């Protein structure tokens, strides 16, 4: 339950005006407003940029209110984002920017559009939610996603050339400094459940807790379909059939037909068959629900890859940017093969996304959990290297995580989490999963090393809890990234696992590795880590809300 007594202004006052701040060396040239702004900014990652963003407030003698400082920092970020949008709109004209990889410029434009949209939503959440911890958690999720968008875009621009490139990089750096400052100033979400009394409810369906954006007729469908999609009324859905017996023969046609910015669930029943298409669900296609006939008969397949010139981001067979996306009983695969390197089957950069009883199959970089809050229940996920990666806040429950045999000379590694700052509310949590090897890998496990994860970025965060770990996982458990950075800043944790690969006596001795206790593990449950009690009940999918 949200803490109604939570007050942003009060907490920020405590955060920034402690006795240590009052002892901050007095500077005669600063008026009281400047002193307050300096105290606020010195706690941010980029104090100079922060102070610059507050100059207007100081110059017109706005009362030194921490909430107003935070909103002004966000307004500055939004203003700088507008300038960056203008630069991006002219990119690619007259060869002022030449892509090194197909889709990298469009990636930037799309991701920055998402950032700008969610900056506005963050401001609204903070203005309206000073007493609502859940709205503040939403704002933190939005800003964490924005920082992930920056990293993805700059990675794509690395291989680009042209006179506009340095201007774009500078504009990105300026804009996202203010976003980073805003995120650091927002208080972290306080625990909504007492771990000592909350317990765990197995197979929980909180069907009474529907968010405002789920309409009543969707309540009825989701409740009726909780034990099987076959109980819904086909007249209330769009039907896709590869054999021509539906409303559409491709999934893309159904997505295009679906209304934009829908507050209703848009139900798309995908009949059994093979759908060879790259599907993009853009930000304005909200609340799309894909329902298959079963992951053994309904297939979405594609073969884009980095090896063929695509960006990792653009290589996805199914790409989801629309909030509220759900899928069940479907197989999503990328058939490019291990020799094509990064080749994504599913990419998700949208909030409140959940998948149930799906299969996600590929080799390197199978599942790109890019950003926002995501949930996967009873899914089978296959791959070789970094096959669950990205910077979402994501929980996997009851999933089979299956490592496949890589190319000769390679090792297998399941996760590559890319949290870039300690302020980001992101990470990978696996609970009650089974970590397994395919038959050919298992038979070669004495020759091929296999690991639970490695740190893609400095503050990488991954935990494995209450899960079965088979013996193919190396005793060290975790692998370094090239060069061995981030070993003291990452957070890798294990809690109450079982199976022959779960023994921790030979685990890495890095400062960032933890054998977790109950309370630490509780922080990575669906309720705490992805605010699951606020939205998972609307999906009809089962979930466990504790340890």
Swiss-Prot record:
It is found in: Secreted, Cell wall. GO terms for cellular component: extracellular region. It catalyses: [(1->4)-alpha-D-galacturonosyl methyl ester](n) + n H2O = [(1->4)-alpha-D-galacturonosyl](n) + n methanol + n H(+). GO terms for biological process: cell wall modification; pectin catabolic process; response to bacterium. The record marks 364 as: Transition state stabilizer. Residues 237-533 are annotated as: Pectinesterase 12. Residues 1-23 form the signal peptide. Disulfide bonds join 379-399. Substrate binds at residues 312, 342, 454, 456. One of its GO terms (molecular function) is enzyme inhibitor activity. Residues 31-185 are annotated as: Pectinesterase inhibitor 12. CDD domains: PMEI-like_3 (cd15798). Glycans are attached at residues 131, 247, 260, 303, 432, 443, 523. InterPro entries: Invertase/methylesterase_inhib, Pectin_lyas_fold, Pectin_lyase_fold/virulence, Pectinesterase_Asp_AS, Pectinesterase_cat, Pectinesterase_inhib_dom, Pectinesterase_Tyr_AS. Expressed in siliques. Acts in the modification of cell walls via demethylesterification of cell wall pectin. The PMEI region may act as an autoinhibitory domain and prevent untimely PME activity during transport. In the N-terminal section; belongs to the PMEI family. This is Probable pectinesterase/pectinesterase inhibitor 12. It comes from Arabidopsis thaliana. The lineage of its organism: Eukaryota, Viridiplantae, Streptophyta, Embryophyta, Tracheophyta.
């Amino acid at each position: 339950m949200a803490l109604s007594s939570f007050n942003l202004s009060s907490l920020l006052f405590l955060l920034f005006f402690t006795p240590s701040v009052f002892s901050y060396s007095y500077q005669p040239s600063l008026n009281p407003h400047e002193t307050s702004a300096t105290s606020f900014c010195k706690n941010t990652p980029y104090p100079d940029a922060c102070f610059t963003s507050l100059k207007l407030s100081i110059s017109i003698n706005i009362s030194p209110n921490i909430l107003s400082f935070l909103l002004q920092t966000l307004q500055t970020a939004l203003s700088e984002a507008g300038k960056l949008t203008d630069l991006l709109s002219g990119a690619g004209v007259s060869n002022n920017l030449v892509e090194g990889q197909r889709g990298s410029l469009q990636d930037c434009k799309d991701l920055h559009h998402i950032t700008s949209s969610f900056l506005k939503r963050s401001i609204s959440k903070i203005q309206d939610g000073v007493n609502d911890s859940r709205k503040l958690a939403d704002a933190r999720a939005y800003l964490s996603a924005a920082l992930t968008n920056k990293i993805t875009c700059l990675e794509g621009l690395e291989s680009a050339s042209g006179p506009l490139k340095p201007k774009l990089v500078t504009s990105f750096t300026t804009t996202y400094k203010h976003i980073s400052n805003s995120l650091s100033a927002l208080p972290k979400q306080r625990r909504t459940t007492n771990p000592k009394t909350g317990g765990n409810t197995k197979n929980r369906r909180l069907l009474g807790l529907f968010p405002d954006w789920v309409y009543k007729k969707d309540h009825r469908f989701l409740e009726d379909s909780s034990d099987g999609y076959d109980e819904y009324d086909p007249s209330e859905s769009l039907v896709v059939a590869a054999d021509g017996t539906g409303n559409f023969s491709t999934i893309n046609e159904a997505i295009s037909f679906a209304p934009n910015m829908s507050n209703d669930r848009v139900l798309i029943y995908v009949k059994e068959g093979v759908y060879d298409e790259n599907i993009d669900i853009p930000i304005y296609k909200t609340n799309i629900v894909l329902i298959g006939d079963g992951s053994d008969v309904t297939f979405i397949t594609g073969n884009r890859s980095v090896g063929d010139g695509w960006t990792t981001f653009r290589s996805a067979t199914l790409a989801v940017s629309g909030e509220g996306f759900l899928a069940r009983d479907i197989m999503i695969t990328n058939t490019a093969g291990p020799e094509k390197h990064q080749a994504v089957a599913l990419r998700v950069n949208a909030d409140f996304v959940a998948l149930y009883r799906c299969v996600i199959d590929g080799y390197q970089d199978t599942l790109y959990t890019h950003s926002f809050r995501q949930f996967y229940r009873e899914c089978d996920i296959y791959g070789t290297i970094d096959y669950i990666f990205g910077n979402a806040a994501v929980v996997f429950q009851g999933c089979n995580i299956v490592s496949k045999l890589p190319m000769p000379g390679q090792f297998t590694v399941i996760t590559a989490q890319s949290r870039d700052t300690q302020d980001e509310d992101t990470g990978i949590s696996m609970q009650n999963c089974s970590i397994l090897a395919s038959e050919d890998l298992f038979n070669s496990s004495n020759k091929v090393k296999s690991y639970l994860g490695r740190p893609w970025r400095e503050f990488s965060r991954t935990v494995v809890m209450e899960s079965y770990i088979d013996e193919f996982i190396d005793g060290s458990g975790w692998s370094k990234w090239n060069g061995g950075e981030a070993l003291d800043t990452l957070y890798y944790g294990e809690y109450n696992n079982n199976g022959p690969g779960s023994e921790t006596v030979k685990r890495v001795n890095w400062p960032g590795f933890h054998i977790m206790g109950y309370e630490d593990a509780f922080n990575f449950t669906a309720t705490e880590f992805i605010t699951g009690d606020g939205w998972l009940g609307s999906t009809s999918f089962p979930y466990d809300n504790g340890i």
